[in-house]
């Protein structure tokens, strides 16, 4: 049985700003683009969240909800420096680390000798070390299954942790709302509920063939997660084939300007992850992914040896205009595929 820890920093970008400027600690604060440039919120602190401000929300909407919101453009060098320090702390416990973004990662500590082999104690020690060395708080989830560790990390936020033992998995899944499964947003959850599927137990009782017919590949993923099946390995840097970043949206978008703002938000994150790749790796292809409100997924990519925002924006617009067919979009993603000239095969760095 595996021991997986998911560590998620608490409102990371905003937390770095509050650490470096204590005057920001108790006021609504968000990191994001300006309203005039149709910006999008990247991160909001907890005082801002009380007003309903959330990540991926248009800045204009955030300012309507919280007119006195303090908006900062972000200091990504500072966030990257803190993220590298956090990653080094993880490496003291295991080499099996899969970063999902600058502020969260999976750790496989199944064979780690630290803390007498206790994943619970390791998570507690990691969180305390992060606070001692960076004055930032983290939350953690511990479970034998990858996606359950991610769900668990959100159950005792901020600055807490939650454990799902192997014996607790069946009972936990039985009552788990489908909207808690990573990748199942509010719109999808509402559609599933309209079909009588509200919890994992409802899906457990469903026919897999019927789910596949209605939802395609998503139906299989939904069925497997509801059964507690998630065999995905922790992908360390040397195993990864691509760099990508994506965002599942709280509400479907129907205007190109909204999609353009999401691409603008995601691009700096893609740049940062690409910069972490070994220098002998170069780009083979880059592309865009859109998921529509009928669960269909489309990707479009082409050969392009250098990362370029304008090229990705053009690809996104072409995909939007040619393949959307009036449908709402619930997920936007950017990715590059990497080529290793030394061994002539693709390697990965996932998000």
From Swiss-Prot:
Keywords associated with the record: Cytoplasm, DNA damage, DNA repair, DNA replication, DNA-binding, DNA-directed DNA polymerase, Magnesium, Metal-binding, Mutator protein, Nucleotidyltransferase, Transferase
Superkingdom is Bacteria
State the active site. 104
User: Which residue positions does UniProt flag as site: Substrate discrimination?
Assistant: 13
User: Which reaction(s) does the protein catalyse, per the Swiss-Prot or TrEMBL entry?
Assistant: DNA(n) + a 2'-deoxyribonucleoside 5'-triphosphate = DNA(n+1) + diphosphate
Q: Which residues bind Mg(2+)?
A: 8, 103
The cellular location(s) given in this protein's UniProt record come to: Cytoplasm
Give any single GO term for biological process: DNA-templated DNA replication
The cysteines joined by S-S bonds are none
Q: Name one GO molecular function term.
A: damaged DNA binding
Domain UmuC: start-end pairs: 4-185
Subunit structure as annotated in this protein's UniProt entry: Monomer.
What HAMAP family does the record point to? DNApol_IV (MF_01113)
Q: What does this protein do?
A: Poorly processive, error-prone DNA polymerase involved in untargeted mutagenesis. Copies undamaged DNA at stalled replication forks, which arise in vivo from mismatched or misaligned primer ends. These misaligned primers can be extended by PolIV. Exhibits no 3'-5' exonuclease (proofreading) activity. May be involved in translesional synthesis, in conjunction with the beta clamp from PolIII.
- Which family is this sequence assigned to? Belongs to the DNA polymerase type-Y family.
What is the name of this protein? DNA polymerase IV
Source organism of this protein record: Cronobacter sakazakii (strain ATCC BAA-894)
């Amino acid at each position: 049985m595996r021991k997986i820890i998911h560590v998620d920093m608490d409102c990371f970008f905003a937390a770095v700003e509050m650490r470096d400027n204590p005057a920001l600690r108790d006021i609504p604060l968000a990191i994001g683009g300006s309203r005039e440039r149709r910006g999008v919120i990247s991160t909001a602190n907890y005082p801002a969240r009380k007003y309903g401000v959330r990540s991926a929300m248009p800045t204009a909407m955030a300012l309507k909800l919280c007119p006195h919101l303090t908006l900062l453009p972000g200091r990504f060098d500072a966030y990257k420096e803190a993220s590298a320090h956090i990653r080094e702390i993880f490496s003291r416990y295991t080499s099996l680390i899969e970063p999902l973004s600058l502020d969260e990662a999976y750790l496989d500590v199944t064979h780690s000798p630290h803390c007498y082999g206790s994943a619970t104690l390791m998570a507690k020690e990691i969180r305390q070390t992060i606070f001692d060395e960076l004055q930032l708080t983290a939350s953690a989830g511990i479970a034998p299954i990858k996606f359950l560790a991610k769900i668990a990390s959100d159950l005792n936020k901020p600055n807490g942790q939650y454990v799902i033992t192997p014996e607790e998995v069946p009972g936990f899944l039985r009552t788990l709302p489908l909207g808690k499964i990573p990748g199942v947003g509010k719109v999808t959850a509402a559609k599933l509920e309209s079909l009588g599927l509200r919890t994992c137990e409802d899906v457990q009782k469903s026919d897999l063939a019927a789910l596949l017919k209605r939802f395609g590949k998503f139906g299989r993923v939904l069925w497997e997660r509801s059964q507690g099946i998630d065999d995905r390995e922790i992908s360390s840097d040397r195993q990864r084939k691509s760099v990508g970043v994506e965002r599942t949206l709280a509400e479907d978008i129907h205007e190109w300007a909204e999609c353009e703002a999401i691409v603008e938000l995601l691009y700096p994150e893609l740049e940062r992850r690409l910069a972490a790749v070994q220098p002998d790796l170069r780009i083979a292809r880059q592309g865009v992914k859109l998921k529509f409100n009928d669960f269909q997924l489309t990707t479009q990519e082409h050969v392009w040896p250098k990362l370029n925002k304008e090229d990705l924006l053009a690809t996104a617009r072409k995909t939007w205009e040619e393949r959307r067919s009036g449908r709402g979009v619930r997920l936007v993603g950017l990715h590059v595929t990497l080529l290793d000239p030394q061994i002539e095969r693709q390697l990965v760095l996932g998000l």
